[in-house]
């Protein structure tokens, strides 16, 4: 049996551009793609924290060090520049693969620069003001 598990997450990135007239996809800074273990062409989900929209597309490598998070094509009708998003990649793992399973969770600042890298999907960075889903009362 294969299980579909979280593989990659870029948490609370800020959308820097959106253009209807691009080929559909999401352009992501190469540094963030590398940190999150996302490859060009890989299927990703994007969740818009500001409006609740969720969509599936694929990743395109953006210029390294620019912090670009670009929403391209029809998705630009659902997600706008300035919106906070979560970019998620999944993979299928066998029971054997799961013995060594760890996700890559990348937290970024307001300029989409990496501030923390972890492997726990429920991780909450210190001082972020976010709630831990395992301990919401804390």
From Swiss-Prot:
Q: In this chain, where does the modification Pyruvic acid (Ser) occur?
A: 25
For this entry, list what GO says about its biological process.
alanine biosynthetic process; pantothenate biosynthetic process
**GO CC aspect terms:** cytosol
User: Which key words tag this protein in UniProt?
Assistant: Autocatalytic cleavage, Cytoplasm, Decarboxylase, Lyase, Pantothenate biosynthesis, Pyruvate, Schiff base, Zymogen
Record-linked InterPro entries: Asp_de-COase-like_dom_sf, Asp_decarbox
List the catalysed reactions: L-aspartate + H(+) = beta-alanine + CO2
Region annotation Disordered: where it falls in the sequence? 116-138
What residues make up the catalytic site?
25 (schiff-base intermediate with substrate), 58 (proton donor)
Cell location: Cytoplasm
Q: How is the cofactor bound?
A: Binds 1 pyruvoyl group covalently per subunit.
Q: What class of enzyme is it?
A: lyase
Q: Which residues form a coiled coil?
A: none
The annotated pathway is: Cofactor biosynthesis; (R)-pantothenate biosynthesis; beta-alanine from L-aspartate: step 1/1
Post-translational modification as stated in the protein's UniProt record: Is synthesized initially as an inactive proenzyme, which is activated by self-cleavage at a specific serine bond to produce a beta-subunit with a hydroxyl group at its C-terminus and an alpha-subunit with a pyruvoyl group at its N-terminus.
Residues bound to substrate are: 57, 73-75
Q: Which GO terms describe its molecular function?
A: aspartate 1-decarboxylase activity
Q: Which cofactor does it need?
A: pyruvate
Quote the EC number.
4.1.1.11
Q: Which CDD domains match?
A: Asp_decarbox (cd06919)
Primary location class: cytoplasm
What family, per the record? Belongs to the PanD family.
Q: State its role.
A: Catalyzes the pyruvoyl-dependent decarboxylation of aspartate to produce beta-alanine.
**Which protein, by its recorded name, is this?**
Aspartate 1-decarboxylase
